[in-house]
């Protein structure tokens, strides 16, 4: 159970692919102009990570080490192609919006990195969980960045959600504030870099605060009964 918890915590927070490893920044910065686009690509990446980790882990004993990387890429490309066709069939609006960034999941360092670092060494169930956790960590980072950029840039949230979830999702659109002209800095790549920088700073501050609390708690436990540590 502790290993399962560690895999989940590492993927979602401690070893977050976007905020710690800084992998896959090209789609992270390019696609997160809206929360819907960010969520769509994040979920697609999560599905690819889960399936590729599961497949690579299952076949790890029959994969020659000398040619393992080309085999990994072939497996990843096959899964990405299947996911791309699914999005094209059931979410065509999202497919048009994401464009080239769906097939570019094949070259995403996150996917190849988890295949080599984890799936090739661990069992199928734990590898699938690792892929799901890493993918959801990246999805959360994309969604937060996309939401911030959409709110600041257009004053809306979940604009175009029907492209991802169907016509019923039009009711999810929220207008935070009305604007006649969008704030282009937030919608363009410079806004993505600024937003990512703020998120990195926020994560650092949270980690430092949590570290300080753990240190103080450990110091209090180490004190003899009745002592407070004050002079």
From Swiss-Prot:
GO biological process: electron transport chain
Membrane topology designation: Multi-pass membrane protein
Keyword field: Cell inner membrane, Cell membrane, Electron transport, Membrane, Translocase, Transmembrane, Transmembrane helix, Transport
Compartment(s): Cell inner membrane
Pfam family membership, one: Rnf-Nqr
Entry EC no(s): 7.-.-.-
Keyword Translocase: yes
Transmembrane segments: 18-38, 39-59, 63-83, 86-106, 125-145, 182-202
Record-annotated disulphide pairs: none
Top-rank lineage group of the source organism: Bacteria
Any one of the GO CC terms: plasma membrane
PANTHER family named among the record's database cross-references: ELECTRON TRANSPORT COMPLEX PROTEIN RNFE, ION-TRANSLOCATING OXIDOREDUCTASE COMPLEX SUBUNIT E
Function: Part of a membrane-bound complex that couples electron transfer with translocation of ions across the membrane. Required to maintain the reduced state of SoxR.
Similarity section: Belongs to the NqrDE/RnfAE family.
Subunit structure: The complex is composed of six subunits: RsxA, RsxB, RsxC, RsxD, RsxE and RsxG.
Protein name according to UniProt: Ion-translocating oxidoreductase complex subunit E
